[in-house]
């Protein structure tokens, strides 16, 4: 089934590239997009929402972020990048090279993540140097643009721009709430989770706004006190400046939105690159992170107490001010246009 999915990805990339002046690809499709670029002679730009490229400055984002005591940081960091890419390439190599063969191309010597560096292809790093300082061992073709924030028109198209009247009213009648969002992390027991959040609101005296994400929390709103509310998909760029702090799953986009709004942040991680972003938040002094397995009433109330402290609030606000001065989308558009214009 996985092989069928990869075949579908290749077919979709091939179709999407028809008539394109330039290809812009994320990490999940870049092996296929690189093959199409080479077969058709179309220029290509890579776009990374998380820092996947090899460096000795931090671990590969999908691996543990704590350096073992018996290794140097440089040794461990490089090793995690190399092992992660080896595992990735072993799993995808046959499918990628089969796709390349269908386009009349020779097999790839390695995953695109490494090969594109050797080829000198440009990569747009869609995050800020304020959050991820530029690694010393990245070449000049790796351009850190700043975070890519969705424009309001795009928000409207995906149904996130509509602001419910009840929400605007609820925000107006009390102090800013703390936002708790679960994003793509499904909640296994919604009633139990909501009961925990209600008790946390009672214990801390804070107002809590719960973003359901992919979880089905419908039908539970009738049981809520005035201090707790539920919402579905919404524009974080609108909402977060009206909040006091954020607690979430640690996706790259939600992390960027919270930090850009200048909010103290706590990340409950489950998998993927979430611990990486949690570690970034902790290093900034803008909050912290822990495994979602630690999520219980005592832990959450302790986290909420930390996030409303004056020191973390001040540090997060300063970071947000610097991030709001950046325009990652405009920087990326300008660079893509320059590259397309050279071909």
Q: Language-model segments: which ranges?
A:
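Nucleotide-sugar-dependent glycosyltransferase catalytic domains
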Residues: 1-177, 184-206, 220-222
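Nucleotide-activated sugar donor-binding and catalytic core shared by glycosyltransferases
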Residues: 77-78, 82-90, 94-99, 103-107, ...
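Residues in the short beta-alpha loop(s) of Rossmann-like NAD(P)-binding domains
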Residues: 50, 214, 271
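C-terminal substrate/ligand-recognition segments
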Residues: 180-210, 215, 232, 236, ...
